[in-house]
C-alpha cells in the first residue's frame, strides 16, 4: 500500500485495523454489503479493508493532495475502482451534502477538536471514531464499544435513530 511521506497521514496500524474489523464483525457483520464512508481517508487503509471484507461500496474523502494521490493508486492497484468513489475535498465541507451510510470511519488528525459538529452532520448507522483520546459522544449517538490500543482510542458509536 502506498502511504505518502511526511507526518500529515497516520495510517491505522495493522493491529488496530484488525481489532476494528473484528468488532464490526461481532456487530452482525456490519461491513458485509454495507455502503461505507472513509472520512479523512489518508491512504485508504480502513475503506480498502472494508472492501476486502465485502462492503458494497466505499466513498473516500481526503483533502490532502499527496494522500489523495496515494489513495487513488491504492484503489487502482487493489482492483477496487468499480466499488470506490474518491472525493478530494475538506471532509467538513462535504459532509452536510452526504448521503446516509451503513458504516463510517472517522480518522482525522489527532489534533482534531470538532467531533460534536462532525458527528452531528454524519448520517450513518455505525461510526468508528479513531483518536488519541476518548471523545464525548453527542446525544444522538450511543457508545457501543471503546478500546485503547497504545496511543490510539477507538470508539464505535451507533446512531440512536437507527434503533427506532
Where are these regions (language model features)?
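Class I S-adenosyl-L-methionine-dependent methyltransferase catalytic core
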Residues: 1-164
Amino acid at each position: 500500500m502506498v502511504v505518502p511521506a511526511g507526518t500529515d497521514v497516520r495510517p491505522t496500524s495493522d493491529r488496530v485495523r484488525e481489532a476494528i474489523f473484528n468488532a464490526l464483525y461481532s456487530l452482525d457483520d456490519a461491513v458485509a454489503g454495507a455502503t461505507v464512508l472513509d472520512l479523512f481517508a489518508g491512504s485508504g487503509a480502513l475503506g480498502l479493508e472494508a472492501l476486502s471484507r465485502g462492503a458494497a461500496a466505499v466513498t473516500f474523502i481526503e483533502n490532502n493532495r499527496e494522500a489523495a494521490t496515494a489513495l487513488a493508486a491504492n484503489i487502482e492497484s487493489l482492483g477496487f475502482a468499480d466499488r470506490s468513489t474518491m472525493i478530494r475535498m475538506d471532509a467538513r465541507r462535504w459532509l452536510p451534502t452526504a448521503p446516509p451510510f451503513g458504516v463510517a470511519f472517522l480518522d482525522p488528525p489527532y489534533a482534531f477538536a470538532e467531533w460534536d459538529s462532525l458527528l452531528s452532520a454524519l448520517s450513518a448507522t455505525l461510526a468508528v471514531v479513531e483518536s488519541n483520546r476518548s471523545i464525548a459522544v453527542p446525544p444522538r449517538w450511543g457508545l457501543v464499544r471503546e478500546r485503547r490500543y497504545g496511543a490510539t482510542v477507538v470508539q464505535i458509536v451507533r446512531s440512536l435513530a437507527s434503533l427506532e
